[in-house]
């Protein structure tokens, strides 16, 4: 029993000693590794020592991601792409023949694309501004033309209105003067008529005989002249002629031109005889024969011609 206990104690001591020895060796190795890691290694870049990827690696990773995200190129674009790669390789070489970092080349390309995009946007903006300015100019021009046209129309309308007003005033003035003259003539005729009516019967008979003789002598009498000659109104002269025709003292016709044509009884008989002899007579034949059968020459003119 004592032997087994002693063996167990010995085994436990051995295990404890082995564990302590193992831990001591591990701590010693770790202490030696830290100073070695802290010291920089010659010929190795700092970024590599720190485990940071190089710029070329970053650019390559970015290019790979862009190629993965980009759509597949067309077959005819494969050759230009290959040529572009060779151009990129040539562009990666600097002026002194040294190869430029891939990241720097990528940044330059990205700047050119962005610059081209910005230039295109600026060009579109300028184009829009130019179109807007042209549109504004057209609007201003059209508005100016409309204003000028309206002004011209207003001027023409004003001129037309003034013209109509002037014509209206002239017409009113002319009518006023005619009315005044008519009133004056009416007053004069009334005075003359009163003086004529106040005469005695002998004077009236003498004037009536002169009236008839005046018509017979002139053959063709303008009614206005007849009225003025005997100080009558034109309507009064017409009424007096119609009364004389009704009682047989005068024979003749009043035409549409305001004239009385005296035709004697002998001339009427000659015209009636001509129509009776010919039977049916046209108006043209009757007019031609009337010129021969009816004498329209005034008595004074005929007497002057005979002398």
UniProtKB/Swiss-Prot annotation:
GO molecular function, one term: ubiquitin-like protein ligase binding
Record's bilayer topology term: Single-pass membrane protein
Principal subcellular localization: endoplasmic reticulum
Signal peptide region: none
A GO CC term assigned to this protein in UniProt: endoplasmic reticulum membrane
Family: Belongs to the DDRGK1 family.
Role: Substrate adapter for ufmylation, the covalent attachment of the ubiquitin-like modifier UFM1 to substrate proteins. Required for ufmylation of Atg9; protects the nervous system during aging, possibly by stabilizing Atg9 and supporting its function.
Designated name of the protein: DDRGK domain-containing protein 1
């Amino acid at each position: 029993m004592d032997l087994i206990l002693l063996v167990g104690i010995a085994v436990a001591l051995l295990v404890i000693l082995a564990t302590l020895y193992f831990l001591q060796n591990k701590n010693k190795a770790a202490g030696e590794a830290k100073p070695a890691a802290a010291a920089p290694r010659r010929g190795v870049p700092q970024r590599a020592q720190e485990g940071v990827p190089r710029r070329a690696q970053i650019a390559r990773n970015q290019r790979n991601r862009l190629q993965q995200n980009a759509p597949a190129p067309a077959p005819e674009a494969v050759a230009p792409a290959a040529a572009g790669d060779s151009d990129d390789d040539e562009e990666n070489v600097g002026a002194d023949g040294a190869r430029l970092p891939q990241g720097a080349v990528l940044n330059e390309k990205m700047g050119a694309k962005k610059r081209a995009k910005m230039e295109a946007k600026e060009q579109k903006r300028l184009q829009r501004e130019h179109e807007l300015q042209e549109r504004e100019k057209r609007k201003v021009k059209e508005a100016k033309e409309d204003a000028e046209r309206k002004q011209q129309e207003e001027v023409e309308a004003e001129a037309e209105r003034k013209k109509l007003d002037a014509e209206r005033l002239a017409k009113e003035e002319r009518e006023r003067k005619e009315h005044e003259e008519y009133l004056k003539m009416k007053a004069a005729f009334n005075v003359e008529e009163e003086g004529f009516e106040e005469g005695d019967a002998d004077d009236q008979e003498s004037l009536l005989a002169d009236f008839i003789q005046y018509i017979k002598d002139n053959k063709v009498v303008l009614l206005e002249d007849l009225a003025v000659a005997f100080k009558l109104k034109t309507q009064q002269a017409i009424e007096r002629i119609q009364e004389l025709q009704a009682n047989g003292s005068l024979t003749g016709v009043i035409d549409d031109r305001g004239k009385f044509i005296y035709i004697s009884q002998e001339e009427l008989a000659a015209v009636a005889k001509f129509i009776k002899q010919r039977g049916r007579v046209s108006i043209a034949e009757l007019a031609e024969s009337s010129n021969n059968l009816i004498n329209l020459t005034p008595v004074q003119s005929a007497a002057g011609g005979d002398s």
